[in-house]
């Protein structure tokens, strides 16, 4: 079903289900002996969501490369990318806090468990923003397995299409303190104008020295829905009915690096191929990837 203005979801439906997909990828990467990431909470969260396909992937009962044996190497590269994407944002947060930042905001936090698994410095406050059903689910499941945050975790249960800056302030956010902002895997699910508004708000809330990290997805401009549906069909044959093309907003939008630069941020980009090379992971060309050559971007706010 296509997206609609004001649509909502939980962790097992629509955009919410993509959080389980990403968490399943983190669970697979956590078992990988290369040790690119360590997310002990990914698999328990996926199991709790209850989508059988993702549970089997997370628990190692189904090898995702078997979806299409003719392109097993490409499928492995997709799993590797999930691990490396996670590692990119992990490293970003660790670098930001090493530089003295003690206020963190994770936009559309989904099943992200960084507030529980990263070694945050004393005094760090991590704000998680997402829809109420998603926040409540994750909080309940992690409490149920005895997980405890490694920073002061403050949840902001609100849709990003609503007045989240006001809700963030109510939760105790200090706009006078530098902040590490993260918008991981989010932008393709926002209309172009909402993407701009998101970063307008982030900038308005940022003190000098704040940092930001997100992705630039060039393929969303000329999004190939047929390629995406072909990939969805492979999963549907395994019992997963998730129509990814209907969840994303494609078409022309502003280049996120250029837009943030225009707002006073000093930005840098790391193309996907360079991210793989940085960690010594072989890169297989994604000939059928409808999202194109993703660039991971980060930067620092210079002026207010």
From Swiss-Prot:
Broadest EC class assigned to this enzyme: transferase
GO BP, sorted A to Z: methylation
Binding site for S-adenosyl-L-methionine: 130, 159-160
GO molecular-function term, one example from the UniProt record: methyltransferase activity
Protein name: Putative S-adenosyl-L-methionine-dependent methyltransferase Mkms_1059
Key words, A-Z: Methyltransferase, S-adenosyl-L-methionine, Transferase
EC numbers, comma separated: 2.1.1.-
Alphabetical list of InterPro entries matching this protein: Ppm1/Ppm2/Tcmp (IPR007213), SAM-dependent_MTases_sf (IPR029063), SAM_mthyl_Trfase_ML2640-like (IPR011610)
NCBIfam families according to UniProt: mthyl_TIGR00027 (TIGR00027)
Upper classification of the organism: Bacteria, Bacillati, Actinomycetota, Actinomycetes, Mycobacteriales
UniProt-listed Pfam families: LCM
Gene3D superfamilies membership: Vaccinia Virus protein VP39 (3.40.50.150)
Function (record text): Exhibits S-adenosyl-L-methionine-dependent methyltransferase activity.
Keyword Transferase applies: yes
Family statement drawn from the similarity comment of this UniProt entry: Belongs to the UPF0677 family.
């Amino acid at each position: 079903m296509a997206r609609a203005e004001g649509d909502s979801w939980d962790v097992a439906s629509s955009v919410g289900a993509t959080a389980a997909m990403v968490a399943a990828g983190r669970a697979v990467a956590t078992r990988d002996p290369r040790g690119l990431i360590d997310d002990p909470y990914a698999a328990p969260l996926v199991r709790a969501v209850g989508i059988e396909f993702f549970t089997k992937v997370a628990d190692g009962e189904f090898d995702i490369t078997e979806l299409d044996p003719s392109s097993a190497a490409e499928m492995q590269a997709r799993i590797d990318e999930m691990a490396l994407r996670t590692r990119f944002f992990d490293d970003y947060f660790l670098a930001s806090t090493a530089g003295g930042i003690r206020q963190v905001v994770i936009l559309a936090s989904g099943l992200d468990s960084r507030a529980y698994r990263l070694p945050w410095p004393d005094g760090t406050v991590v704000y998680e923003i997402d829809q109420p059903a998603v926040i409540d689910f994750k909080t309940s499941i992690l409490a149920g397995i005895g997980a405890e945050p490694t920073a002061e975790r403050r949840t902001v249960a609100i849709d990003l299409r609503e007045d989240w800056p006001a809700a963030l302030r109510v939760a105790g956010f200090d706009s006078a303190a530098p902040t590490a902002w993260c918008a991981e895997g989010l932008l393709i699910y926002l209309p172009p104008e909402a993407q701009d508004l998101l970063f307008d708000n982030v900038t308005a809330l940022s003190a000098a020295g704040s940092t930001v990290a997100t992705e630039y997805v060039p393929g969303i401009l000329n999004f190939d829905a047929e390629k995406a549906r072909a990939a969805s069909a492979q999963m549907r044959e395994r019992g997963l009915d998730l129509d990814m093309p209907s969840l994303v907003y494609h078409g022309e939008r502003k280049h996120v690096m250029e837009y943030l630069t225009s707002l006073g941020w000093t930005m840098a980009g790391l193309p996907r191929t360079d991210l793989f090379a940085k960690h010594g992971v072989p890169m297989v060309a994604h000939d059928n990837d409808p999202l194109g050559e993703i660039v991971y971007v980060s930067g620092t706010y210079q002026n207010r």
